[in-house]
Design a protein with these regions (language model features):
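Conserved beta-strand -> loop -> alpha-helix junction used to position metal-binding or nucleic-acid-contacting
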Residues: 1-5, 17-29
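Conserved RecA-like helicase ATPase core segment
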Residues: 14, 134-177
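Accessory N-terminal region flanking or inserted into the helicase ATPase core
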Residues: 28-120, 129-134, 158, 164
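Active-site catalytic microenvironments for nucleophilic, acid-base chemistry
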Residues: 7, 80, 101-104, 137, ...
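Catalytic glutamate of the conserved HExxH
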Residues: 123
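P-loop NTPase Walker
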Residues: 1-14, 110
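Residue-level signal for alpha-helical context at structural boundaries
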Residues: 19-22, 116, 130, 142, ...
């Protein structure tokens, strides 16, 4: 997804378009707590907030969320973009930006679909909801042959938001055999 953002970053609508020199960060609990304090919400659970950032579609302003949640998530994005000379992005934010690019630029999405007649999804048991939503945006209804492989007994990324029933969801979504 990083490569897609780097290539198509200029197609991200304002105010979400990052500069070319954005920096990838890996926030820890303390980083989130610093933001929560500055936003006047010191008791926010950082794991739930991190999951919300990873799963919310852009633009946040158009999502069906409680107003307080929408404002809080938007404030985080603004905080990460605060110093435009050094925008701070996490990999989940990059995922959301790429999904947004594909949603608002059908020609880019079509070019992606035409580039890949087959897609192999390895270790699918560890796919997150955000990753799966990006796969759906890219390939649902495209006629691309998708192959998801993995082993539920080897699922190790539950702590990081890996989907429950990943293969069932894949089978239902893509009418897989």
């Amino acid at each position: 997804t990083k490569q897609m953002l780097d290539r198509f970053r200029m197609a991200v609508p304002a105010p979400y378009m990052p500069p070319a020199n954005y920096r990838i960060v890996f926030p820890v609990k303390g980083d989130y707590q610093d933001f929560f304090r500055s936003a006047g919400r010191p008791n926010t659970d950082h794991k739930r907030f991190e999951a919300a950032i990873a799963n919310v579609s852009l633009p946040i302003e158009e999502q069906d969320l409680k107003e307080a949640v929408r404002l809080f998530l938007r404030a985080y994005w603004e905080h990460q973009y605060e110093n435009f000379a050094e925008v701070l992005l996490t990999f989940p934010m990059i995922n959301r930006l790429v999904k947004y690019i594909l949603e608002v630029n059908p020609e880019i999405n079509q070019a992606l679909r035409l580039s890949y007649g087959a897609v192999f999804l390895d270790e699918f048991q560890d796919t997150t909801l955000a990753q799966f939503s990006l796969i759906r945006t890219c390939f649902e209804g495209a006629g691309t042959r998708l192959t998801a492989v993995g082993d539920d007994k080897q699922k190790i990324m539950g702590w990081a938001g890996a989907m429950d029933r990943a293969f069932d969801v894949f089978t239902e979504t893509f009418d897989a055999r």
